[in-house]
């Protein structure tokens, strides 16, 4: 959605909203965002069908303003605490937060949290005792890391990949974002589910995107459409 459907204010423009609503085509939003961050666009576009959040960790529908999960793939709970502790120790300046189905959590307000708030207009839930909070049964779908230093981001990504944790996948989503989801949470898996559910043929489908986390999705559709703002390696697949 960011860098693709949404404008610089994080909104669907009136022109695009009207064109999409009047197209008569079924539209699914496929995003790294949480459902709460997708809600405004879904309502603006009048979408009623399946939507995909958290890079494929959640397939859902909006029903009467509520999220109705269809397929969920949260992170392994004990690994969430392990990752949070490790990242805080090794990369204390990186902005870190995480999501369950309906909430965005953090333990401090920093530049990354303020940036995300301005982009999505969401308010984080502040956690003062994280160990106790995570002792309860809770489905965490995504850990989000933000750094505006490219060198720090590259070091963070390479370090996390070197941990060789088989249950997670690590993806860049924009220049400043690194996101951790379950290994089975991929946009392409969400697309496959919708293909089967709606009995779609590949030649009937197109996808728009601009990031590395869109590449698996592009491989599933007949018409991958890459935005002008994408990097050259992403444009190469179009």
Model-identified regions with their sequence ranges:
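Asp-based phosphoryl-transfer active-site loop
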Residues: 1-10, 218
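Conserved beta-strand/loop elements of the cytosolic catalytic core of P-type E1-E2 ATPases, chiefly
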Residues: 6, 74, 181-185
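Active-site phosphate-binding/coordination module
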Residues: 11-113
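Phosphate- and divalent-cation-binding pockets in alpha/beta enzyme and binding domains
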Residues: 15, 37-40, 155, 190, ...
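Short active-site oxyanion
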Residues: 24-28, 47-49, 142, 203-204, ...
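Hydrophobic residues within well-ordered alpha-helices
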Residues: 55, 191, 217-221
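Conserved acidic, metal-coordinating active-site core of Asp-based
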Residues: 94-208, 212, 229
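Asp-based, Mg2+/Mn2+-dependent phosphohydrolase catalytic module
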Residues: 201, 224-238
